């Protein structure tokens, strides 16, 4: 009876809990993070009388995008679960003691690279990525594209008076 319990405990430690934790982390990565603990509802202005499915309102696209993808929030328990999964994976994929004369296989090299990446993720400071928005710069000598100017440059056809310079 004790052998069965020992095997069950080993199974739980090796397979069940890490996979359950990994599934919880994977499921929580797919869920949207709600900022400030409340859900923002989209304004419902469309009624049955003026709703036309073929008509698209482009002025509300930015609003829909912000409601669909709320701001990035760092949840302590979510981060803790991810770190625990990374720790489990790093211990599971730790290289075994190998003789020096043996050649390392490509699979082992991939495991070592993944292990280095996971350890870097564990030791890095956990700050969310910041989006840097840059305004587009338009040079002052820029002139708008005109079909007539393009035709005159490419085909040598000129329509209208010459430019006085």
UniProtKB/Swiss-Prot annotation:
It comes from Klebsiella pneumoniae subsp. pneumoniae (strain ATCC 700721 / MGH 78578). Keywords: Cytoplasm, Periplasm, Signal. Belongs to the SecM family. Residues 1-37 form the signal peptide. It holds the Pfam family SecM. It is found in: Cytoplasm, Cytosol; Periplasm. Its main location: cytoplasm. It comes from the Bacteria. GO terms for cellular component: cytosol; periplasmic space. GO terms for molecular function: translation regulator activity. This is Secretion monitor. Regulates secA expression by translational coupling of the secM secA operon. Translational pausing at a specific Pro residue 5 residues before the end of the protein may allow disruption of a mRNA repressor helix that normally suppresses secA translation initiation.
